Amino acid sequence: RRRWVRFWSNLRTERIYIRAWRQSARQFGFTLTRELLLRTRGASLEFGRALLEQALGGGFCFEAVRMERIRIAEEIIRMESPVCKPGVRQTLDALHRAGVPAAVATSTSLPLTRTHLALSEILDDFSAIVTGDQVARGKPEPDIFLLAAERLGIAPEACLVVEDSESGLQAAEAAGMQRVLIPDLGPVSETARQSCLAVLDSMQALPPLLSRLRT
């Protein structure tokens, strides 16, 4: 029987980050569009830096805007408290009953990730947390997923990645892991969709799928 491990995007934080990026950029006299920011979803810091600097020109100070974005995002998160996507709690409970370990693998920094999980009251539900600041190469490179599998002590080919971004799917494929797509904000190509084990409408459809996979 195969052991399936969850790596997921479990909080409604993407919209917070977009708000924070746009607000921070305005303070520095720049306009960041939602469409441009969606292209950075799940990608490495280096990719995001190159994309935004190319789009906004030489006067754009990426690091200064990013640091202010972090401050704004933390403020929003603490004031509004992130909530889990519907189905996350049920999925975690199902995994615990089945004895399947779960991990978080996210491009977000470790401090922000731990804050998100703690405020959502699911921090203790994960056996491993791997963040973008812990690996040399971000998504779409496989490093973040490979490190998560290593920390769990499970072979990559026995892992199941649940993703909502194309760069995340590419990283999981490069790691040799099975993929499930639950689309969220950004577009995902038909090629990426077809490479997945399943494409679900919401996290609520995940527990039944996991149950079928383990039988």
Language-model features: locations:
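Asp-based phosphoryl-transfer active-site loop
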Residues: 1-15
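Conserved SAM-binding loop
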Residues: 10, 84, 102-105, 137, ...
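Helix-loop "lid/cap" segments that line or gate small-molecule binding pockets
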Residues: 24-25, 44-59, 116, 148-149
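Metal-dependent phosphoesterase signature
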Residues: 52-90, 98
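Asp-based, Mg2+/Mn2+-dependent phosphohydrolase catalytic module
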Residues: 93-96, 109-215
